[in-house]
């Protein structure tokens, strides 16, 4: 991205997180994903006359826990409001949300920003509020990916009424990278809490970006534009970077920025105008008369606070300070809760932390990616990985042999000790066994021996390689190197 000086971007994110409750926010209808359209609806979802909503207690618990994890102040009482608008995805013609009395306000999230060729830094991003609301249905446009150009549209109400929390950041973000990392940290947090799977592909986590530019940090805010339709963290970063440059170009050419909603076009890598932005007054909010106010006691908040797990930011600090991992490795390990738990259990079973980190982030992650599996699907137990790492440390097997048996351990979760014994893969680590093989090599390669003695000392690697071939990788490489060097120099 080009140098923006003297311009500065001002960015805020509205993040919608679907909560993974089994039933919807105000009804017992299922929240299962991927089923036939309009199979998870009922009279409450459809807004039929005489139906009354009832708040799902688990939704409140998950929303409060998310608020506490994001350092928000949870209100002692809050209420639901009706947000009025007419659109086919809302069968009631209003959405139940929270307006002037949200569940929680004034929090923050510390984000680690790592940019290429730049020093990693921490950024504390303020969070304005978190509120609960119901999701809308989904329109499917036939013949186009959007309403314009489609032959006709169909609506699926399976998603309507699913519980959401909307997390609104303060305008503290200044770059596309910061926006992307902030959204990533939100996803890590809700996954660690177990309140959402955070899958952007399934719509479980959706981000809208509000962005403007101004001439320097002390200038007044410019006109903000909302960007939608970003289904990955890289798309968030690219959309922000494109929009920043677009707005600067408009201003520098004497143009005007309009308050509007724009869509990110992934194929063309640009934002396109969708509609002029509505203000909050257009929605005619008023308190929902069918839902009473919510009161949350201090005792209940304290209980939910005690139930919070260790969050990714704390794990990163612990891995660096207590276990000696690099900041990069600590980020990779803590990125996914299943990986972090697996790593910690491996270390608890006696494995060296750095070795455990290396095996997990390179070999195991590589295997899972090539087999299109997630870490949650890993069959290998931490006990067996720790056993394999300790066998390498104790020179029972070589690293080469460990790499060869790892796929079998992952597939069947069997003891590495058992595999090594059954296949005779134990490391040859005594001079008495290696020395006769070296004598064979001296006889087989007289020209190479002469060349070594004439000064071509790099041939030492050749002899070590031949010895490893003869022992099928089972010889101790350090011992082999030492014994061959002694023989050739004698």
Swiss-Prot record:
It is an enzyme of class 6 (ligase). One of its GO terms (biological process) is glutaminyl-tRNAGln biosynthesis via transamidation. Its EC number is 6.3.5.-. InterPro entries: Asn/Gln-tRNA_amidoTrfase_suB/E, Asn/Gln-tRNA_Trfase_suB/E_cat, Asn/Gln_amidotransferase, Asn/Gln_tRNA_amidoTrase-B-like, GatB, GatB_C_1, GatB_Yqey_C_2, Gln-tRNA_amidoTrfase_suB_CS. One of its GO terms (molecular function) is glutaminyl-tRNA synthase (glutamine-hydrolyzing) activity. Keywords: ATP-binding, Ligase, Nucleotide-binding, Protein biosynthesis. It comes from the Bacteria. Pfam families: GatB_N, GatB_Yqey. PROSITE patterns: GATB. Belongs to the GatB/GatE family. GatB subfamily. Heterotrimer of A, B and C subunits. This is Aspartyl/glutamyl-tRNA(Asn/Gln) amidotransferase subunit B.
